[in-house]
Amino acid sequence: MLILTRRVGETLMIGDEVSVTVLGVKGNQVRIGVDAPKDIAVHREEIYQRIQHERTIQSQMQHLEQGSFAPSFDDEDYFNR
């Protein structure tokens, strides 16, 4: 993990197209602005995790509807816990 120190108003670049600017600091909260192309999704981590979880459930539901769902786990790993 890269650790950077920035002050209010300072920006960091991610690649050529994404910039992250520190807009303010109040107590233990940091307000940032992200400027990215529309084709790059930007989410808070908890929202991203929820989206991934919902996609997994949706995929499993599609497999159930198609009758091709089978639980997947490695027998050896499961029984060697």
UniProtKB/Swiss-Prot annotation:
Report the principal subcellular site.
Answer: cytoplasm
Q: Per its record, what are the GO molecular function terms?
A: mRNA 5'-UTR binding
Query: Per the record's keyword annotation, is Transport included, yes or no?
Result: no
**Which InterPro entries does the UniProt record give?**
CsrA, CsrA_sf
Stretches of the chain forming a coiled coil according to its record: none
Q: Mind telling me which SUPFAM superfamilies this protein's record contains?
A: CsrA-like
Q: Does the keyword Transcription regulation apply?
A: no
- Where does it sit, as one GO cellular component term? cytosol
Q: Can you say what this protein is called?
A: Translational regulator CsrA
Q: Species name for this entry?
A: Psychrobacter arcticus (strain DSM 17307 / VKM B-2377 / 273-4)
Name of the gene this protein is made from: csrA
